[in-house]
Swiss-Prot record:
Residue ranges, annotated region (RNA binding): 248-254, 272-276
Active site: D92 (proton acceptor), D267 (nucleophile)
Official protein name in the record: Queuine tRNA-ribosyltransferase
Short name of any one Pfam family annotated for the protein: TGT
Gene3D superfamilies found in the cross-reference section: Queuine tRNA-ribosyltransferase-like
The protein's required cofactors: Zn(2+)
Highest classification ranks of the organism: Bacteria, Pseudomonadati, Pseudomonadota, Gammaproteobacteria, Lysobacterales
EC numbers: 2.4.2.29
Keyword terms, alphabetized: Glycosyltransferase, Metal-binding, Queuosine biosynthesis, Transferase, tRNA processing, Zinc
Length: 381
């Protein structure tokens, strides 16, 4: 039996306010999970992540398996001890990383053989191997091993990929249970941008039975309207009593639109990666600090922001100077700001859902950016 408990507390339209409870802590939803690919969120300490409001982080099964390897992580009792993070951790299965190595991989019914991006060695990964790795990592949420359907993909290609993922889902479930792992196991809905395939995938996953359901194969190049259409299609079909996780998404707008369509959990490298490239998120849009107009700008990234960078008074001019000099303090401060912004955005959405004012929140979110609020299904533009 899984250690995860999920409580759906209230809804506002399709937006959902809930709580995930694990032995290692609780996670208020909707939630954004900072990504710690190699066991650390780049440029920030674990205690700083917690102070920003994050309650769960994501680790990367694929990369941690290749380096440092399971022996080293096992010596620490798992990923929590290795990374010095005592809260819940979700680990992906390695499926997306295999997808990203298209030119180095060979997919068969058994699994995937690929060349390691580290040293070129041949490596095999299948559902059983992924479940074994995640058992050693001792994550709180384990993801099934699947094939991420590329975009664009014909319906036939997407169907064959989805059917393979379903067979792998069954093997993942059996391997996970066979290991006696009481961590939560999430299924992953595939099917590209084809509604019928998405329905078939979800039906197959529910027949197997999972603790939560992720929506995969999106944020891989498809237009935003197609992504939203898939979320709208799945919302009434997903079990209300299980958490829903939109993988690899995304921009602040994507989070708002995902929540509006019933998503509970998100992850993305965007806030940390963009910080390292001098792009800082604010309520009025993105500050691109390398722009010359910030050379003598005495404002903070966002006046009134409570992050360490803004509350300490670091100016845009100073951050631009650090960035131009390749000083490591620039991405550190930028990461603190961006993750604070993301976590506050999620907290504000949770509060709006609880208060029954999510529609107003969404309008204000776009108005602050000088943008028109996109209509939801059933609304006029």
């Amino acid at each position: 039996m899984s250690r995860l408990q999920f409580q759906l507390q209230t809804t506002d339209g399709h937006a959902r306010r809930g709580r995930l409870t694990f032995p290692r802590g609780t996670v208020e939803t909707p939630a954004f999970m900072p990504v710690g690919t190699y066991g650390s969120v780049k440029g920030i300490l674990p205690e700083q992540i917690r102070a920003l409001g994050a309650e769960i982080i994501l680790g990367n099964t694929f990369h941690l398996y290749l380096r440092p390897g399971l022996d080293v992580i096992g010596d620490h009792g798992g990923l929590h001890g290795f990374a010095r993070w005592d809260g819940p951790i979700l680990t992906d299965s390695g499926g997306f990383q295999v997808f990203s190595l298209a030119h180095r991989r060979k997919i068969t019914e058994q699994g995937v053989t690929f060349s390691s991006p580290n040293d070129g060695a041949r490596v095999f990964l299948g559902p059983e191997e992924s479940m074994q790795i995640q058992k050693v990592l001792d994550s709180d949420i384990v993801m099934i091993f699947d094939e991420c359907t590329p975009y664009p993909a014909t319906e036939d290609v997407a169907r064959r990929s989805m059917e393979l993922s379903l067979r792998w889902a069954q093997r993942s479930r059996q391997a996970h249970d066979g290991l006696g792992n009481d961590a939560a196991l999430f299924g992953i809905v595939q099917g590209g941008v084809h509604p019928d395939l998405r329905s078939r995938s979800l039906d197959g996953l529910q027949a197997i039975g999972f603790d939560g359901y992720a929506i995969g194969g999106l944020a891989v190049g498809e237009p935003e309207h197609e992504r939203n259409a898939m979320l709208e299609h799945l919302h009434p079909r997903l079990p209300a009593e299980r958490p829903r996780y939109l993988m690899g998404v995304g921009r602040p707008e994507d989070l708002v639109e995902g929540v509006a369509r019933g998503v509970d959990m998100f992850d993305c490298v965007m806030p940390t990666r963009n910080a390292r490239n001098g792009h800082y998120f604010t309520s009025f849009g993105t500050v691109r600090i390398r722009n010359a107009k910030y050379e003598r700008d005495l404002d903070t990234i966002e006046p009134g922001c409570g992050c360490h960078a803004c509350s300490s008074g670091y100016t845009r001019a100073y951050l631009r100077h650090l960035d131009r000099c390749n000083e490591m303090l620039a991405p550190m401060l930028g990461t603190l700001h961006n993750l604070w912004y993301y976590e506050k955005l999620m907290a504000d959405m949770r509060a709006a859902i609880a208060a029954g004012t999510f529609v107003e929140f969404r309008r204000s979110f776009y108005a602050a950016r000088g943008a028109t609020t996109p209509p939801l299904p059933g609304e006029s533009s």
